[in-house]
Amino acid sequence: MNNVIDGKALANEILSELKHEVQRLKDKTGESPKLAIVLVGDNPASIIYVKNKIKHANKIGIDTLLLNLPITIKTEDLIAKISELNLDQNVSGIIVQLPLPDSIDKNKILSAISPSKDVDGFHPLNVGYLHSGIDNGFVPCTSLGCLEVIKKHEPNLSGKNAIIVGRSNIVGKPLSALLLKENCSVTICHSKSQNLSSITSKADIVVAAIGSPLKLTSGYFKPDAIVIDVGINRIGGNKIVGDVDFENVKSKVKYITPVPGGIGPMTIAFLLKNTVQAFKIYS
């Protein structure tokens, strides 16, 4: 049995469905969804991520607008740019590529995006909806991608023991809310958690999102675990690895996502799904 989950194939299924939906919407309204991407500075990794998002958006018929702003821009000037996008009726969704320079107040920037265009799901209102169990806002894309992968391979999550290693607002916290909604018993661990392997080795589902290359070795998992690796770490120059020691773990668990080719493609697919949803709500 091939237990390595092909995130790219799953993402392509979603993108194919979205492409047909975008065409139907265009036939009906004469317009296409439009995603505005705000990129501050010239962080090489951010540039790669943004190009990838634009490529996949355009491939399925979503228009894109890239605002590439200087690293010297002030918080208030960036907020003014976002306000213009909020008012632009042709823009369906807005994302600000993270990380931002230290000189910019990230919380103010994310709060400046209109919640109805916040397709990354980072606005405090959308965060509040998610953690209140209200289906009325956008949910962070990586956490949606993780849940989709998990449910494809374990449709009934009720009563399952899920451990999330990582407490970020992008993955750990939103995914905990999604898994709780599926009636999982959820534990969040992090870099300061003690005896981590003794906790994760009891879990049915382990999500690694701690940003520590190859940290979780085979002793961290029980044999029938589903392992979702969200980590993206660069080692030895150009090699990309996850937070899980993939080569030594893959034969010892039920399912595992690779890095790259696992959760990354799913994140982009759900970003574009959120963008289409924003367009449908507005139109």
Swiss-Prot record:
Single Gene Ontology MF annotation: methylenetetrahydrofolate dehydrogenase (NADP+) activity
Top-level taxonomic group: Bacteria
Keyword Hydrolase: yes
Gene Ontology biological-process annotations: L-histidine biosynthetic process; methionine biosynthetic process; purine nucleotide biosynthetic process; tetrahydrofolate interconversion
Pathway where it operates: One-carbon metabolism; tetrahydrofolate interconversion
Residues noted as binding NADP(+) in the record, renumbered to the chain: 166-168, 191, 232
Gene Ontology cellular component list: cytosol
Keywords, ordered alphabetically: Amino-acid biosynthesis, Histidine biosynthesis, Hydrolase, Methionine biosynthesis, Multifunctional enzyme, NADP, One-carbon metabolism, Oxidoreductase, Purine biosynthesis
Catalysed reactions, semicolon-separated: (6R)-5,10-methylene-5,6,7,8-tetrahydrofolate + NADP(+) = (6R)-5,10-methenyltetrahydrofolate + NADPH; (6R)-5,10-methenyltetrahydrofolate + H2O = (6R)-10-formyltetrahydrofolate + H(+)
EC number from the UniProt entry: 1.5.1.5, 3.5.4.9
Protein family membership: Belongs to the tetrahydrofolate dehydrogenase/cyclohydrolase family.
Subunit structure: Homodimer.
Function: Catalyzes the oxidation of 5,10-methylenetetrahydrofolate to 5,10-methenyltetrahydrofolate and then the hydrolysis of 5,10-methenyltetrahydrofolate to 10-formyltetrahydrofolate.
Official protein name in the record: Bifunctional protein FolD
Name of the gene encoding the protein in the UniProt record: folD
